[in-house]
Amino acid sequence: MDRRRFIKGSMAMAAVCGTSGIASLFSQAAFAADSDIADGQTQRFDLSILQSMAHDLAQTAWRGAPRPLPDTLATMTPQAYNSIQYDAEKSLWHNVENRQLDAQFFHMGMGFRRRVRMFSVDPATHLAREIHFRPELFKYNDAGVDTKQLEGQSDLGFAGFRVFKAPELARRDVVSFLGASYFRAVDDTYQYGLSARGLAIDTYTDSKEEFPDFTAFWFDTVKPGATTFTVYALLDSASITGAYKFTIHCEKNQVIMDVENHLYARKDIKQLGIAPMTSMFSCGTNERRMCDTIHPQIHDSDRLSMWRGNGEWICRPLNNPQKLQFNAYTDNNPKGFGLLQLDRDFSHYQDIMGWYNKRPSLWVEPRNKWGKGTIGLMEIPTTGETLDNIVCFWQPEKAVKAGDEFAFQYRLYWSAQPPVHCPLARVMATRTGMGGFPEGWAPGEHYPEKWARRFAVDFVGGDLKAAAPKGIEPVITLSSGEAKQIEILYIEPIDGYRIQFDWYPTSDSTDPVDMRMYLRCQGDAISETWLYQYFPPAPDKRQYVDDRVMS
């Protein structure tokens, strides 16, 4: 398996998979639309045509790695690449009256070697034209690009695109598609965070991970005053092709994407990931191992939330493990899942560069029946914040064979809070630390005599107040070890309850401990389910080291 690093900021990771066969499919191509910058010939286009295109492409051999870039682009530094600006006067919808949205393209260069073709579509006539690369579409500033090497390179293509929304037209983008099949969006903070992907292949198998590419996009010309736009995409890789339709609603406080895909397998696929998302978790309230900085927490997302097909809500706090971990949570027709960033308090991060308190959550809502499968969660060890180490996706139960065709529909919510939440009590935070002593009486003369690890889980909302007089009962299940010193504490500042227990080992095993807990009152569940994975230290590390100097 091969993971990749992200260049944070305006860039996603560079594409590393093969080129598309779209050039042969469009050898006679032709497209028309209302954009001033579209310069290709006209040809009809709609989703059914794109589906046929993807289907036919799957019958041909994948064309492999992208062709080399001109030297002046291939050797660019990240700083030089970032200094290239698209000319806002030549934006895609610049000539649309009362436009509320506009689109600009990313330049090829540096690690962005995969040629992406762009087309402008007139939705009234279903006619489109290609937008060919030309240097005059960009301002090169001090990037040091030798534009003479780019003259006549109309087939160079682009690296991706981004969309702006009024009143920040041409200033602050709200949607970005860049690198392989990665894309992102923001909420009203204009702060990017985690990413989504068109598809994930062999993320956790004995094969090398495959990163499909979006190799072409078709943009319906937006209507005057509209804050919704539609873009179509062709996906291609060694194992699969796909036709995608994105209907993207750029609302005041969030971005909502309606996604429809039609997939065509070239080869057998061991692990297919639908609606994949990629995030970062370095340290948080539950995992302090990598928090030796001035920042109390460093993460794009703090939990995986799942609304199962049977109605159960699950909160799974994220980890930065010492060893790569992959967990698969079985479900049947899931109602939704997502990686959430619910802690929005600046004081909990103290970060004026990353602004992690402003980063959006991403929620997936299936729009058709997905059947049986698993929600996969991969957590990769990281020493800092420049590696996206969290991956989550839906994996259908049925194995994918060459020639298979299937379709998925889902909605993505990029927002501060997911559109739905558990009506019962919800997990607010998870904390861990030294155990083995009564709360409030940590001994000052010596460490606790017996080693233990304390867990404190805060629940808020639901019917906790009504349940309290009747008796709140935490139901705790452990895969190994035992829970002792279980306490139920009312926390006035959050108007909620903290369930606290100490975990004691019953063996020398260092295997991960799966923990499960929910709250019950008179036999009925009154909270969502808390899932956690704890990694016990080796037996010789299960002791407290007194490093005080008393003389």
UniProtKB/Swiss-Prot annotation:
Q: What is its main location?
A: periplasm
Q: Which GO terms describe its biological process?
A: beta-glucan biosynthetic process
Cellular component, GO annotation = outer membrane-bounded periplasmic space
**What superkingdom does the record give?**
Bacteria
Q: Which InterPro entries match?
A: Gal_mutarotase_sf_dom (IPR011013), GH-type_carb-bd (IPR014718), Glucan_biosyn_MdoD (IPR023724), Glucan_biosyn_MdoG/MdoD (IPR014438), Glucan_biosyn_MdoG_C (IPR007444), Ig-like_fold (IPR013783), Ig_E-set (IPR014756), TAT_signal (IPR006311)
**Signal peptide range in chain numbering:** 1-32
Q: Where in the cell is it found?
A: Periplasm
UniProt keyword list: Periplasm, Signal
Q: In which pathway does it act?
A: Glycan metabolism; osmoregulated periplasmic glucan (OPG) biosynthesis
Ranges annotated as spanning the membrane = none
A molecular function (GO) term: catalytic activity
Q: How is it modified after translation?
A: Predicted to be exported by the Tat system. The position of the signal peptide cleavage has not been experimentally proven.
Its function? Probably involved in the control of the structural glucose backbone of osmoregulated periplasmic glucans (OPGs).
Family note: Belongs to the OpgD/OpgG family.
PANTHER family from the entry? GLUCANS BIOSYNTHESIS PROTEIN, GLUCANS BIOSYNTHESIS PROTEIN D
**The name this protein goes by in its record:** Glucans biosynthesis protein D
Q: Which gene encodes it?
A: mdoD
